[in-house]
């Protein structure tokens, strides 16, 4: 693709010191994602998928190589600038929704906008529109404990997308759901990725979900290979 990548990493490596030993988790890893592209990463437990996501999201620093998000090298930014870039250009969805329990669905979705200094009326308007889009217009004032598992994950997806980021990273987004609910969440993610032209990077054990992506990569022995 000639279009500028929304996310890229070059020669990415990560190792940890365990006593006198250095344990290499990732080695010379290469990856590019372009606007609107959907990529799945699969691999056994302990293969380094969570480590990779933390590096790609700027939550950890590599031992070697670098990560570029929306043209900015993450390790070259201050912690404050990294946080602002993440809030603007990146959304996260986890297996467990990580919604704030004391806030309503609407308030949870407003959070990234308010962090980015969006005025409260505009934040509420945009969050309401997105919650309606994911089928939760009737649940705006409900707190997470009052929502089903599938509804909570829809709120989490709306929160990840409310700033219209170029990329959303999803870590086992259907792993905590029954098969019927998981299928509905899959369909929603694919529709939103297409209509909003948002790149999705999905880490999953669910090969049915992985096959819905444009590419599937396996993380094994610290490297990514197409499958």
Swiss-Prot record:
Cellular component GO terms held in the UniProt record: plasma membrane
Cleaved signal peptide residues:
none
What Gene Ontology molecular function terms does this protein carry? ATP binding; ATP hydrolysis activity; transmembrane transporter activity
Q: What's the EC number here?
A: 7.6.2.-
Localization per record: Cell inner membrane
List keywords of the entry alphabetically: ATP-binding, Cell inner membrane, Cell membrane, Membrane, Nucleotide-binding, Translocase, Transport
Keyword Acyltransferase attached: no
Its GO biological process terms? lipoprotein localization to outer membrane; protein localization to outer membrane
Q: Where is the ABC transporter domain?
A: 7-227
Q: Give the record's membrane topology.
A: Peripheral membrane protein
Task: Name the residues that bind ATP.
Answer: 43-50
**What does the subunit section of this Swiss-Prot or TrEMBL entry state?**
The complex is composed of two ATP-binding proteins (LolD) and two transmembrane proteins (LolC and LolE).
The entry assigns this protein to a family as follows:
Belongs to the ABC transporter superfamily. Lipoprotein translocase (TC 3.A.1.125) family.
What the protein does? Part of the ABC transporter complex LolCDE involved in the translocation of mature outer membrane-directed lipoproteins, from the inner membrane to the periplasmic chaperone, LolA. Responsible for the formation of the LolA-lipoprotein complex in an ATP-dependent manner.
Q: What is this protein called?
A: Lipoprotein-releasing system ATP-binding protein LolD
Q: Which organism is it from?
A: Pseudomonas fluorescens (strain Pf0-1)
Q: In the record, what lineage is assigned to the organism producing the protein?
A: Bacteria, Pseudomonadati, Pseudomonadota, Gammaproteobacteria, Pseudomonadales
As recorded in Swiss-Prot or TrEMBL, the protein's gene is named lolD
